[in-house]
Amino acid sequence: MRNKNIKKVVLAYSGGLDTSAIIPWIKENYSSEVIAFVANVGQNQADLKDIEYKALKSGASQCIIKDLREEFIRDYVYPVLKSGALYEENYLLGTALARPIIAKSQVDLALKLKADGVCHGATGKGNDQVRFETAYVGLAPELKIIAPWREWSFKSRGELLSYLKEKNVKTTASIEKIYSKDENAWHVSTEGGVLEDLWNKPNQDCWTWTNDPKDAPNVPEIISIKIKNGSVIAVNNEFLSPFKCLEKLNLVGIKHGIGRIDVVENRLVGMKSRACYETPGGTILVNALRSLEQLVLDRDSYKWRQQIALEMSYVIYNGNWFSPFRKSLQAAATELATEIDGEVILELYKGTVTAIRKFSPNSLYSKEFATFDQDEVYRQSDADGFIKLYSLPSKIRAINKCMNKALMK
């Protein structure tokens, strides 16, 4: 049942087909003032050029655009990168990471403007509805939530286009645009269309940013990345802000076809879905960080980091960014990353990233101890006592088996 006592709503507005239709629909069905909120998280900047005009023409009372690019990469992407989180061992969580900062900024604006409610354009089949609404209720439970896709009678893009035509709202969307895309500074995703048949190979329409690896340059490119406390601080000896570092890595990654994956994943809402993800800069960063972790983290710390990564991936994917569990995982990941300092030299070539040189002042690797040549620092005879103690449980278990067999005779 619709709550008609909502006088002012802040909508997470993208300028696409869905949110363009939501503005007149809310006004018609709730008699509410609609304020369009646009979060600039690094999506195609050309799409933002006329977005205020589009929102106002659709019926919004005002359109507020906030540049969140630096905050998004610094406070959301980089911290999670330290944890090593990869959802189902593949997905760098590009969409899932953007939702909490959008929702938080939307809620902050709603409270500032004394709005009664917030609204999103996520469908009733996807994960984003859960991510947005879990954030909303966790940050401001007093705000009412409007989720049009769970309320209105529209069933297709064609019906939405007809509705916009009826309301005299212009849109660049069409029946032919069959792919669902999400883009921010960290990644771009593509779903739908030919991807819904698992027997179909992704065509060029399924890739938005990156060159096809086979069409990438025939000559490898060497780059350097400097890292401090698990965060990238410089690319090719140029010290830049978090967003600018990523922007630079994205450009070089796009050129070399880095960061493409085609996956089938388990959605939070129960079904499986297929998507093509492109995370060029992120893929380069992950390789650089893993290279330094191999040098710096001891065995138990590395095992603990792997456990953190697994738990963090589910927490983020499932929309629990603002939970105490996520914060405790983040604290652990941040502590582990305090000694992840150093420099990595990487080779980029036709979709591959290879760390060819690496250095850390905190490295636990010692050439003197690890050498296969004659050395004077590691006495191999010391291993005798260690092996006897380490293998003691196995020895006792074997002795017990022998004794039990003897008793059975």
Swiss-Prot record:
L-aspartate binds at residues 123, 127-128. It is found in: Cytoplasm. Pathway: Amino-acid biosynthesis; L-arginine biosynthesis; L-arginine from L-ornithine and carbamoyl phosphate: step 2/3. InterPro entries: Arginosuc_syn_C, Arginosuc_syn_N, Arginosuc_synth, Arginosuc_synth_CS, Arginosuc_synth_type_1_subfam, AS_cat/multimer_dom_body, Rossmann-like_a/b/a_fold. The keyword ATP-binding applies. GO terms for molecular function: argininosuccinate synthase activity; ATP binding. GO terms for cellular component: cytoplasm. The keyword Zinc-finger does not apply. L-citrulline binds at residues 91, 127, 131, 180, 189, 265, 277. PANTHER family: ARGININOSUCCINATE SYNTHASE (PTHR11587:SF2). This is Argininosuccinate synthase.
